[in-house]
Design a protein with these regions (language model features):
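Class I S-adenosyl-L-methionine-dependent methyltransferase module
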Residues: 1-108
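Amphipathic, non-transmembrane alpha-helical secondary structure
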Residues: 118-122, 159-162
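Short, glycine/charged-enriched secondary-structure capping and boundary segments
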Residues: 78, 127-128, 144-147
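Adenosine-cofactor binding site in Rossmann-like domains, unifying the SAM/SAH pocket
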Residues: 106-117, 153
Length: 172
């Protein structure tokens, strides 16, 4: 959405921010969970192959949730639903128009692909910058977070990623 229609996203976020900041603490909590529920429900309905205004709404909800959830985390449950709880912030900056506009400019000639990380080499050349940020391996028996998505990022995935990094390094 930032790439295709930054101004509509800015306008939508501005409306949400103005509404949200006028709410009491209790009303903010209720509004957060309402948006989280809508976000989780609507993500199943969006056709990500064909751009339409639903992308703007989904993107504005995502940014709103990120800016108002606990510690700005992104996490989903086993059903793939965003499940980070409400964060109690007094005056959150829900969006930064200048940042959105700049990101839109930078993404203008960018191709974004969603898929398995192993396919990224098919799209690289000597000017490509690759950045990987997998979940950390648990460091204790009580620590079990291994995924930002419904699929686990286990030891086998860590090994696959390490092998890919070696391949990228050797390629130059």
């Amino acid at each position: 959405t930032i790439q295709k229609n930054a101004m509509s996203l800015v306008l939508e976020l501005r409306k949400v921010e103005q509404f949200y900041l006028k709410l009491s603490d209790d009303e903010r909590r209720v509004f957060f969970y309402k948006i989280r529920s809508q976000f989780n429900e609507e993500r199943r309905k969006i056709n990500y192959s064909v751009y339409d205004y639903s992308w703007v709404i989904q993107s504005s909800q995502f940014i709103f949730l990120n800016r108002t959830c606990f510690n700005g985390l992104y996490r989903v449950n086993s059903a793939g639903e965003f499940n980070v709880p409400f964060g109690s912030y007094k005056n959150p900056k829900i969006f930064d128009q200048e940042n959105i506009e700049r990101a839109s400019e930078l993404l203008e000639d960018t191709i974004i692909i969603c898929g398995d990380f192993s396919t990224c080499l098919d799209y690289t050349d000597d000017k490509t910058f690759l950045y990987f940020d997998p979940p950390y391996r648990p460091i204790s028996g009580t620590s079990s977070f291994t995924s930002y998505t419904k699929e686990d990022f286990d030891d086998d995935e860590q090994i696959r990623l390490a092998n890919l990094c070696r391949e990228v390094s050797e390629k130059g």
